Design a protein with these regions (language model features):
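Terminal domain-initiation and capping elements
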Residues: 1-77
Length: 77
């Protein structure tokens, strides 16, 4: 089973705030963080990671939520 971590577009966080949180929480390269933030902004959601264990996905989701992002996990189909 694969657990996907998703970031959703919202009316609160700016593009820059989303990219910043992805860099800080995931140590994601700035270019990748900007691309993920743009995808969330344009399509409403961006997958930022996929994990074979539920616990790491939940931990990352909680950290993103602590930054104020609208993040969730789902089981990949």
């Amino acid at each position: 089973m694969t657990w996907r971590v998703l970031v959703h577009n919202d009316a609160i966080n700016s593009f820059a705030a989303v990219a910043y949180a992805l860099v800080r929480v995931l140590s994601m390269p700035v270019e990748h963080a900007a691309a993920a933030a743009r995808q969330a902004y344009e399509s409403g959601v961006a997958e930022i990671g996929a994990y074979t264990e539920r616990e790491p996905a939940e931990a990352i989701t909680a950290r993103l939520q602590a930054f104020g992002l609208n993040a969730s996990i789902e089981v990949a189909a």
